[in-house]
Amino acid sequence: MIEISELKKHYPAPGRKTVEVLKGISLTVPPASITAVVGPSGAGKSTLAKCISLLEKPSSGSIRVNGEDLSQLSGDALRAKRRAIGTVFQSSALLQRKTAWENIALPLEWLGVVPGEIKRHVGQLLDSVGLSDKANAFPAQLSGGQRQRVGIARALALKPSVLLADEATSGLDPQATSSILALLKQLRDRFGLSIILITHEMDVVRRAADAVAEISDGWLVQQGTLSDLLSSPQSSLGQRLFPLQPLEASGDILLQLTYGDRPLATDWISQLSQQYQLHIDLLAAHVEQVGERLAGRMRIAVRFGAQRPRHQVLIQQLYQLGINAEILDLQPALQEAG
């Protein structure tokens, strides 16, 4: 587990005392989970990555890995504890004159691990990333996705509990991106890793993350599980992760629906239609498998029959069925009726 608390980072600047790049970031990533960190260019993602990997010392705050504050360490103590955090960058940064096996073995050799143990462990790592048959291949003989797999194996060589993946899929083709994301999820489950996935691609977040945090101008502005964000009508991050295309529609009431935080009745449309004599048009929908539950966001237009229930009654009934509803448009006659 990694726990980041009130993390701040500032730099000296000409004509000013300091420039504050990170402004009190707090974030917890449990074991066996992937948290994506998103945000625009200049938001502070790269600085956060440097602080997490302890390439930069935070100005204040703490970075705890398995309960120990690494941000207060220095020298040999810091170098020893830094092994708990493996890092994968956009470029795999492999040594071109060394084979895949030799690149993965480097951290172990620097640590002084005995050759027999190195051979055993590197073999296991190559198997873990699906490259057992590429042990003797040089980087130039590997595809971009395969090189990134070697980089991931090398990051895991010292058996970290935290893996930082900084734009690890940027620049890869769609097939390689899919394979790397699938690999990260497999490694999360196999080794119980806390994975921090820094990315600017919302599709990567949707496909791999359990939770997501958004940074803007050095502040942590939103965070939550994908299910929570998708099922929250007020979440701007959820709307960007799971967008709906605007459509022209007519009806007595136009609703935006979100679900996923509670069990959903699968026959909710027929239940409502029969109970209140409604005609429901599905205008747009975005449904994702989040963990073991379906979560979704949709827009519907509702035309009432002769019964015409109060719109508050309809929204309450939707809630009882496991759906959160937000009114986007309401006919004047219904507004007057309440």
Q: Which sequence ranges carry the predicted segments?
A:
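ABC ATPase NBD coupling module
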Residues: 15-17, 70-86, 110-115, 229-233
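Helix-to-loop junction immediately C-terminal to a conserved catalytic motif
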Residues: 53
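Short coil-to-helix segment of the ABC ATPase nucleotide-binding domain corresponding to the Q-loop/switch region
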Residues: 98-105
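Conserved signature/switch motifs of ABC ATPase nucleotide-binding domains
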Residues: 137-140, 158
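Catalytic Walker B motif of ABC-type/P-loop ATPase nucleotide-binding domains
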Residues: 163-166
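Helix N-cap at the start of a conserved alpha-helix in ABC-type nucleotide-binding domains
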Residues: 174-176
